[in-house]
Amino acid sequence: QRGEHVAIVTPTASGKSLCYTLPVVSAAMQDKAKALYLFPTKALAQDQVAELLELNRAGELGVKAFTFDGDTPGDARQAIRLHGDIVVSNPDMLHQAILPHHTKWAQFFENLRYVVIDEIHAYRGVFGSHVTNVLRRLKRICAFYGVQPQFILCSATIGNPHAHAQALVEERV
């Protein structure tokens, strides 16, 4: 809640997603804040959206969560850009479909408060370097829109989460 970047490391099925979902949903409801969730696979992203939709239905929260990936129909993309409170995607879609077209996402970026990166252990080696560069571009575009989102980085299986998280976002975590 203080806006500091954080790394969350806890075993699988221990409630990691609740650690970030509760403040994200609360901010979306109270302040119209936006969040971008990044997962390394479509399956994980779709699971997260299903959980968010179930939480939303159960609590009648009014928070709109959408998957934005290569399978997202063209006619749905504009609605996601304009009305998504939580956009769930992957680093490649961020790189290829969101950042190059950031002017179409202006309303989203102007209100972006959280960037959640799950399964950070998947981002190492050449792919990890690529993701670091994509995140660098994301931060530059966020600065253009006058925001500095909080990064929340998660993993269940990483030996040195603090150092790895800092290397990914190139900031103190």
What are these regions (language model features)?
Residues 1-145, 149-154, 163-168:
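Conserved P-loop/Walker A NTP-binding site and adjacent catalytic elements of P-loop NTPases
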Residues 159-160:
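Conserved H-loop
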